[in-house]
C-alpha cells in the first residue's frame, strides 16, 4: 500500500472512531497526523486547508489531554508545515512562532526526548531560512542571477542546570496558558 492510501485509510478510520468516541485524544491525534501527512499530496491551497483541519484535531486532542506531549509536538509540526507554505513573511513568522511555542511545551513535558529538542532548535532557525528561501525564489522568478546567503545558525551556549529548571517551569506555565486560550477559543 502506498503512503497516500495508507494515511487515507488512517484518516477514514479515525473519522469513524470519532463518531463513536469524540473524546478519544489518541484518535484525534492520529487523525491530525494523517491529515498532516496527506497534506503533502495536495496543491498549496488544499494543503493549507488540510493542515488547518489537522491543527484543529490536534488542539482538540490537547484540550482532552493537555499532557499529551506527542500531540503537542505534532501540533508544532503542523504549524511549521503551514508556515513553510505561507509566502507572506509576517504570517509565516507567526506560525513559526506557534511551532516554536508548541515544540518548547513538548520539550518541557519530555525533557529527555532529543527529537523534541531538535525540533525546537530547527523552529528557532526556520523564519530566517523561510525568508531566504522566498527571497531566492522571487529572484529566480524575476530572472535574477544573484542568490542570497542563508544566515549561519546562532551558536547555542550551554546553560546551567538551575537556568534549565526555570526554563522548564516557564514552559509549563506557558503550556497552561496556551491550553486555557485554546479552551476559551473553542468555547466561543
From Swiss-Prot:
Disruption outcome: No visible phenotype.
Q: Which GO terms describe its cellular component?
A: mitochondrial outer membrane translocase complex
Arranged from A to Z, the UniProt key words for this protein are:
Membrane, Mitochondrion, Mitochondrion outer membrane, Protein transport, Transmembrane, Transmembrane helix, Transport
Membrane-side (Mitochondrial intermembrane) residue stretches: 183-188
Pfam families in the record: TOM20_plant
* Tissues expressing the protein: Barely detected in roots.
Q: Which GO terms describe its biological process?
A: protein insertion into mitochondrial outer membrane
Cross-referenced InterPro entries, in alphabetical order?
Answer: TOM20_imprt_rcpt, TPR-like_helical_dom_sf
- Where primarily located? mitochondrion
Question: Per UniProt, what is the membrane topology?
Answer: Single-pass membrane protein
Zinc-finger keyword on record? no
Write out the transmembrane intervals: 165-182
The residues on the Cytoplasmic side of the membrane are 1-164
- Subcellular location per the Swiss-Prot or TrEMBL entry: Mitochondrion outer membrane
Give the family per the record: Belongs to the Tom20 family.
What miscellaneous comment appears in this entry? There are four genes (TOM20-1, TOM20-2, TOM20-3 and TOM20-4) which encode mitochondrial import receptor subunits TOM20, but TOM20-1 is the only one that has not been directly identified in isolated mitochondria from cv. Columbia.
Fill in the subunit field for this protein: Forms part of the preprotein translocase complex of the outer mitochondrial membrane (TOM complex) which consists of at least 6 different proteins (TOM5, TOM6, TOM7, TOM20, TOM22/TOM9 and TOM40). Component of a mitochondrial large protein complex that contains, at least, MIC60, DGS1, TOM40, TOM20 proteins, and petC/RISP.
PANTHER family, per the entry: MITOCHONDRIAL IMPORT RECEPTOR SUBUNIT TOM20-1-RELATED
Q: What does this protein do?
A: Central component of the receptor complex responsible for the recognition and translocation of cytosolically synthesized mitochondrial preproteins. Together with TOM22 functions as the transit peptide receptor at the surface of the mitochondrion outer membrane and facilitates the movement of preproteins into the translocation pore.
Name of this chain's protein: Mitochondrial import receptor subunit TOM20-1
Q: From which source organism is this entry?
A: Arabidopsis thaliana (Mouse-ear cress)
Q: What is the name of the gene encoding this protein?
A: TOM20-1
Amino acid at each position: 500500500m502506498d503512503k497516500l492510501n495508507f494515511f487515507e485509510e488512517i484518516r477514514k478510520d479515525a473519522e469513524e472512531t470519532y463518531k463513536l468516541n469524540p473524546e478519544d485524544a489518541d484518535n484525534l491525534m492520529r487523525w491530525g497526523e494523517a491529515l498532516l501527512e496527506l497534506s503533502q499530496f495536495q496543491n498549496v491551497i488544499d494543503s493549507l486547508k488540510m493542515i488547518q483541519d489537522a491543527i484543529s484535531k490536534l488542539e482538540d486532542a490537547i484540550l482532552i489531554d493537555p499532557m499529551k506531549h506527542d500531540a503537542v509536538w505534532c501540533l508544532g509540526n503542523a504549524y511549521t508545515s503551514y508556515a513553510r507554505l505561507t509566502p507572506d513573511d509576517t504570517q509565516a513568522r507567526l506560525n513559526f512562532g506557534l511551532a516554536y511555542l508548541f515544540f518548547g511545551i513538548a520539550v518541557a513535558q519530555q525533557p529527555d526526548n532529543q527529537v523534541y529538542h531538535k525540533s525546537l532548535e530547527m523552529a528557532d532557525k526556520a523564519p530566517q531560512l523561510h525568508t531566504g528561501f522566498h527571497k531566492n525564489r522571487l529572484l529566480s522568478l524575476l530572472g535574477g542571477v544573484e542568490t542570497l546567503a542563508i544566515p549561519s545558525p546562532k551558536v547555542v551556549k550551554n546553560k546551567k542546570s538551575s537556568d534549565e529548571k526555570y526554563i522548564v517551569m516557564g514552559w509549563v506555565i506557558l503550556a497552561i496558558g496556551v491550553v486555557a486560550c485554546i479552551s476559551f477559543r473553542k468555547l466561543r
